Curated annotation (Swiss-Prot):
CDD domains: EFh (cd00051). The keyword Lipoprotein applies. GO terms for biological process: regulation of signal transduction. Residues 25-59, 60-95, 96-131 form the EF-hand domain. Pfam families: EF-hand_7, EF-hand_8. Belongs to the recoverin family. InterPro entries: EF-hand-dom_pair, EF_Hand_1_Ca_BS, EF_hand_dom, Recoverin. This is Calcium-binding protein L. Gene3D superfamilies: EF-hand.
Length: 191
């Protein structure tokens, strides 16, 4: 799938469906929406990303949208590919907590070693904090989760946290889960 992503192969659609639980129709609608803002077919620029998300998240300021853009631009090329776009939507829509946490882990395990190291964990926490601030949470509410995550990493000989450890630790922290899963009021606007 190139940056323009004008067509998805059936394998691409199946992969997206298996990772996100979106239906084939939803994937098609997401692609249509993506293409409607991807004017130059090179992936979403920051301005295109802002135009899509600012309609759906009216209370987000430019700094929050920029931060989301930087986080979801996983290859750091200044463009949001369709794969990155689907990831962004999946994270901010109402999906099962364990699926969302699994996806978060996969998205932030950039070196694909099966562990979140300190920097990768920090990036997840930044996402949660940025999201929560945009929704009116007190930033200090994430402190206990962050501390627990970092403490468990320090106790592990591998210097990181596995997907299973992350899901277990994150899913029992109501504050962290709410910070990432608060988009229920946006259900009708998102997928």
């Amino acid at each position: 799938m190139g940056q323009g992503n004008s067509k998805l192969s059936s394998d691409d659609i199946k992969k997206i469906m298996s990772k996100t639980n979106y239906t084939s129709e939803q994937v098609s609608q997401i692609l249509k929406d993506y293409q409607s803002v991807n004017q130059d077919s090179k992936g979403l620029s920051l301005e295109e990303f802002k135009s899509f998300f600012s309609i759906r998240f009216k209370d987000y300021d430019d700094a929050s949208i920029l931060h989301m853009f930087k986080i979801f631009d996983s290859d750091k090329n200044g463009r949001i590919s369709f794969k990155e776009f689907v990831g962004a939507l999946f994270i901010i829509t109402k999906s099962p907590v364990s699926d969302k946490l699994s996806f978060l882990f996969d998205m932030f395990d950039r070196d694909l070693n099966g562990y979140l190291d300190l920097e990768e964990s920090y990036n997840i926490l930044k996402l949660a904090l940025n999201t929560s601030v945009g929704l009116g949470f007190d930033v200090s509410q994430a402190g206990s989760f962050a501390e627990g995550l970092l403490n468990s990493m320090n106790r592990n000989s591998h210097g990181g946290i596995t997907k299973e450890e992350f899901i277990k630790k994150a899913s029992v922290n109501d504050t962290f889960v709410r910070m990432l899963c608060l988009y229920q009021s946006y259900d009708t606007l998102l997928y």
